[in-house]
Swiss-Prot record:
It comes from Clostridium perfringens (strain ATCC 13124 / DSM 756 / JCM 1290 / NCIMB 6125 / NCTC 8237 / Type A). Residues 402-549 are annotated as: Oligomerization domain. HAMAP family: CPSase_L_chain_A (MF_01210_A), CPSase_L_chain_B (MF_01210_B). Belongs to the CarB family. GO terms for biological process: 'de novo' UMP biosynthetic process; glutamine metabolic process; L-arginine biosynthetic process. Mg(2+) 3 binds at Q823, E835. CDD domains: MGS_CPS_II. The large subunit is composed of 2 ATP-grasp domains that are involved in binding the 2 ATP molecules needed for carbamoyl phosphate synthesis. The N-terminal ATP-grasp domain (referred to as the carboxyphosphate synthetic component) catalyzes the ATP-dependent phosphorylation of hydrogencarbonate to carboxyphosphate and the subsequent nucleophilic attack by ammonia to form a carbamate intermediate. Binds 4 Mg(2+) or Mn(2+) ions per subunit. The gene is carB. This is Carbamoyl phosphate synthase large chain.
Length: 1067
């Protein structure tokens, strides 16, 4: 039992949905913390709204409440479960803010709940900008000249006093939300207004900019006895001015002198002692590159994105140790699981280099402002480990899955030196490639350092890489000798990069490596620089001499992970990968994971028998397979990242378990799939590929509007749009053919029907459908952005029978062994198939949890040769539960300047929440609350701007809203129609007309909800785009689908928002 015998039942608060600034790292830390508590015999009650997480599984906590993370709902959980303690530091900013709110509202005192780990007072001192600054002054730690600002005028006055540029840092926000650098008064007014609105306490720190100084981070641990260690220090390659979440980070720091390192280490320990942290803490410093002057930027008094990175970089389990400290243990009493000999008070040492590179979502948001600053915009990140910086860096580049294997980027070749300089001085997500092009053209390193703030050490490394690339380009395969190839491999060059530059195939380089015996060795991440023997089977590749992998003769399977979190491929696939690993280990099969994401549970070395932290490219995966010689490889759970390796592995005669490469092709190739549907007599929306505007218009006239148009090769609905008439179609096709005239545009009849989705399991003979899901928004909204209901609420028994029949026919005809995801449309009483994915999908965690069927476990056992009828869950459609569960998408568009907000065929959500209720209205209300959507609880003024095709339907909803007490503001046309329908509506002027116009009302927050159905989504020149953006940036609700608005109307008519709602333990 723990040292503190009073702790028997602990409430752990999770971090909620994945959003920019708060991603999978909190599932990793939360899972680790829950396991650490259970190890001590403590009952764990978890509350988290995100169903896609491992931490909300029944194996991780004793009680799981998938409920909204609000004071109201968490109080209900506390009242029902009566925990004696609360662990707040594992749920990111969300968990921290909620713990402070529960404390300040007296709820923790009311139920006698003690906060364990870092106290509320210490959290406040770390998070409140004024308290933190005062504390730093008391302990003589330098802070940047700053002022706490709570109103605009005071901010302007302070900026005039200290001079521009200034940095705006809102209190209690996530990922720098609402903040930024202001170079002049006009920019300050805009940024400060946003920051004050988005801070939960209306407080902003305005500070003198030290843009260009080095940004250094220390991850520190402290126990309640005052023992303190630094786990890891990290250096941002990008200087201060770019959010650390958007910076390339290297560990350990590469450019600090011993004096600088020790100076900042001592400062970190002084700060963590002064604040009174008990657990983990991240300290960020700005360091003047020309002197020993430094300043404390901020601390995070909790586990964070950086602590997940530090954990994976060192092998030191920060969240687990923090949880043990919260129970009263000292660092000298907690065993290091990696070595099994040393204790947590032993500081890790690294004999390798780790590089983290962010993964940005700009492929999904073509019009987005890509400029990087103090507001975080990355959705995820990759980590790479190498025996030198260059090797780790190049591994990182190829791990990003952006089609780059070196520092060369075609788009920068034609830019002038002036244009390149502009791209480097005003950094964006592609700056590193522009910088490499400057070095390629001979730009002096000292000048590049001066204009970028990047240390000469890193620039010299980049220059060496660029020079080697140039040498290769000027050579042939005959010039390549063993010595040169070995040098290139040691510095991280992939076979593909070398082959591309020598204009040969990667197989040719692989063949030479085989002849010359140039094979990677695998080293262990051991926390102690080889000083003690390690037990952890956690490896990275290097081309040095000694190999530390022990290859067994056991039956073994490789599981390919899903790589970095990005829109369309999120934490759901890590969930599936981890469950696959658990299922294999239960069958006593040696399980090997390959992945490169430092935020996830799958890259926790305790999850699998062996973990290879490597890029998910053909070469890197093949090297591991060559080494381990597994009995099979599983690709089904790693999303598109894993599936796209299927063809390559087949060519290399490597067995994949479950569905084969040919079967994947059958499902994903449009022509083959259309032939299959015809043979099976299954309908799909009519359509074809067109090559010109004229052909497109002719096909549209044949099919009849509305029409769904999209490029022929897309993922995640990229570039899809619904057009309602010839004018809209002409606009789309003209732009599409201008961008790409070499591929056809697909034109399908758009069926405005109900979308239905299933995740099914097949063993080649039978099929099990754990549940039939219904989408709330009609077809045309990407399935990942739709509200999803289970059990389905509006589907007839006849359609359910057809769903099962079509699922069976498709799964058995394709030859699925394992998982299949199918999306249907029900239109005018008939069922159509719109998409088949021969793998796990993003709905797997949701349907697993709410149906009670362990989908991934069953699918994995089928891949190993078992049959559905022997696994205890039957076949056909599984029985429906009593409770209704609604999955609601969550968006991060507020954090991405100039991106589209409206729902459509292209996926934009970053995460999801679950709402569980006795009926669909209760579940929807909880889902809306959990997703921070508009619920009508705070204000009832609606701005309506509705396109002509939607006006008739909107008028019916407006009548209901009018009866519910809503007020309407509308532009001339809509206002006139509302009045004609007997609804009072205030008229407002359009954008660009004299004040007060629409924009004035939004800026003054005189509107509570914007209902805007877009005429042309993604067109940033149109009024609708500006209205949606202005509203979302001011935390005003926006609905662009009348189906979502109808759901709001129905739950209000049912009074779900006024009921005393229950909370449900899903175990």
């Amino acid at each position: 039992m723990p040292l503190n015998k009073d702790i028997k039942k602990v409430l752990v608060i999770g971090s909620g949905p994945i959003i920019i600034g708060q991603a999978a790292e909190f599932d990793y830390s939360g899972t680790q913390a829950c396991q650490a508590l259970k190890e001590e015999g403590i009952e764990v009650v978890l509350v988290n709204s995100n169903p896609a997480t491992i931490m909300t599984d029944k194996e991780i906590a004793d009680k799981v409440y998938l409920e909204p993370l609000t004071v109201e709902f968490v109080e209900k959980v506390i009242e029902k479960e009566r925990p004696d303690s609360l662990l707040a530091g594992m749920g990111g900013q969300t968990g921290l803010n909620l713990a402070v709110e529960l404390y300040e509202k007296g709820i923790l005192d009311k139920y006698n709940v003690k906060v364990i780990g870092t106290s509320i007072e210490s959290i406040k001192e770390g998070e409140d900008r004024e308290l933190f600054r005062d504390m730093m002054n008391r302990i003589n730690q330098p802070v940047i000249q700053s002022e706490i600002i709570t109103d605009l005028d005071a901010g302007i006055a302070f900026a005039r006093k200290i001079g521009y540029p200034v940095i705006v840092r809102p209190a209690y926000t996530l990922g720098g939300t609402g903040g930024g650098i202001a170079n002049n008064e006009e920019e300050l007014i805009e940024t400060l207004t946003s920051g004050l609105q988005l801070s939960t306490i209306g407080q902003v720190l305005l500070e003198k900019s030290v843009k260009g100084w080095k940004e250094i981070e220390y991850e520190v641990m402290r126990d309640s006895f005052g023992n303190c260690i630094t786990v890891c220090n990290m250096e941002n390659i990008d200087p201060v001015g770019i959010h650390t979440g958007d910076s390339i980070v290297v560990a350990p720091s590469q450019t600090l002198s011993d004096k600088e390192y020790q100076m900042l280490r001592s400062a970190s320990i002084d700060i963590i002692n002064a604040v009174g942290i008990e657990g983990g803490c991240n300290v960020q410093f700005a360091l003047n590159p020309h002197s020993f002057e430094y300043a404390v930027i901020e601390i995070n008094p909790r586990v964070s994105r950086s602590s997940a990175l530090a954990s994976k970089a060192t092998g030191y389990p920060i969240a687990k140790v923090a949880a043990k400290i919260a129970l009263g243990y000292g660092l000298d009493e907690i065993k290091n699981a990696v070595t099994g000999m040393t204790y947590a008070c032993f500081e890790p040492s690294l004999d390798y280099v780790v590089v983290k590179i962010p993964k940005w979502p700009f492929d999904k948001f073509q019009g987005a402002d890509r400029a990087l600053g103090t507001k975080m915009m990355a959705t995820g990140e990759i980590m790479a480990i190498g025996s030198n910086f260059e090797a780790a860096f190049l591994k990182g580049i190829r791990s990003l899955e952006i089609g780059k294997y070196s520092l060369e980027h075609k788009k920068f070749k034609d830019l002038s030196m002036y244009e390149l300089r502009e791209r480097v001085v005003s950094p964006d997500d592609e700056r590193i490639f522009a910088l490499a092009e400057m070095l390629r053209r001979g730009y002096r390193i000292d000048m590049v350092s001066k204009i970028t703030g990047i240390d000469i050490f890193f620039l010299e490394k980049f220059r060496w890489l660029v020079e080697e690339e140039q040498k290769l380009k000027q050579s042939t395969i005959d010039d390549l000798n063993r010595e040169w190839l070995l040098k290139l491999k040691r510095r991280g060059f992939s076979d593909k990069a070398i082959a591309d530059m020598l204009k040969v195939s990667p197989d040719e380089i692989y063949r030479l490596r085989d002849i010359w015996h140039i094979k990677p060795a695998y080293k262990m991440v051991d926390t102690c620089g080889g000083e003690f023997e390690a037990l952890s089977p956690y490896y990275y590749s290097t081309y040095e001499q000694y190999d530390e992998v022990v290859v067994s003769d056991n039956k073994k399977v490789v599981v390919i992970g899903s790589g970095p979190i990005r829109i369309g491929q999120g934490i759901e696939f890590d969930y599936a990968s981890v469950h696959c690993v658990m299922a294999l280990r239960k069958q006593e099969i040696e399980t090997i994971v390959i992945n490169n994401n430092p935020e996830t549970v799958s890259t926790d070395f305790s999850i699998s028998d062996k973990l290879y932290f490597e890029p998910l490219t053909e070469e890197d995966v093949l090297n591991i397979i060559d080494k381990e010689k597994p009995d099979g490889v599983i690709l089904q759970f790693g999303g598109q990242t894993a599936i796209k390796l299927a063809k390559f592995l087949k060519e290399k005669n490597i067995p994949t378990l479950g569905t084969t490469s040919d079967q994947i092709d059958l499902a994903e190739d449009r022509e083959q799939f259309d032939d299959l549907l015809e043979r099976l007599n299954i309908a799909r929306p009519k359509g074809k590929g067109v090559w010109s505007l004229e052909e497109g218009l002719e096909e549209a006239r044949r099919l009849g509007f509305p029409i769904l148009v999209r490029p022929s090769f897309v993922l995640g609905g990229q570039g899809m749009e619904i057009t309602h008439d010839e004018e809209e179609l002409t606009y789309y096709l003209t732009n599409a053919f201008e961008k790409d005239s070499k591929n056809p545009i697909l034109i399908d009849k758009y069926l405005m029907g109900r979308e239905i989705e299933v995740d099914a399991i097949s063993d080649g003979e039978d099929v099990l459908v754990p549940g039939i899901m219904e989408h709330l928004e009609r077809a045309g909204v990407h399935s990942g952005d739709s509200i999803t209901m289970y059990p389905a609420q509006n589907i007839s028994d006849k359609i359910k029978e057809d769903v099962l029949d079509y699922t069976k026919k498709l799964a058995l005809s394709i030859g699925i062994k394992g998982m299949i995801n199918i999306q249907f449309i029900e239109f005018e009483g008939k069922l159509y198939v719109i998409e088949v994915n021969p793998r796990a999908s993003r709905t797997v965690p949701y349907i697993s949890k709410v149906s009670g069927v362990p989908i991934v476990d069953i699918a994995t056992r089928i891949m190993l040769g078992e049959r559905l009828k022997d696994l205890g869950y039957g076949t056909g459609v599984y029985k429906e539960p009593d409770l209704v569960s609604v999955k609601v998408p969550v968006f991060s568009t507020q954090k991405l300047p100039n991106v589209e907000v409206s729902l459509g065929p292209e996926m934009r959500s970053t995460g999801e929440v679950l709402g569980v209720g006795r009926n669909v209205f209760e579940a929807l209300y909880k889902g809306f609350v959990g997703a921070s959507m508009y619920t009508g609880d705070k204000g009832k003024t609606i701005l309506a701007t509705i396109k002509k095709h939607d006006k008739k339907e909107f008028m019916e909803l407006a009548k209901d809203l009018d009866k519910l007490g809503y007020n309407f503001i509308a532009t001339t046309g809509t206002a006139k129609e509302l009045r004609e329908a007997g609804i009072d509506a205030k008229e407002v002027r359009r954008i660009g007309e004299e004040s007060p116009n629409i924009m004035d009302l939004i800026k003054n927050k005189e509107i509570d909800l914007v209902v805007n159905t877009p005429t042309k989504a993604n067109d940033s020149k149109r009024d609708g785009f500006h209205i949606r953006r202005a509203a979302i940036e001011r935390n005003i609700g926006v609905m662009t689908s009348l189906d979502t608005l109808k759901a709001l109307v129905e739950l209000q008519k049912e009074g779900a928002h006024n009921r005393e709602l229950e909370v449900f333990n899903l175990i």
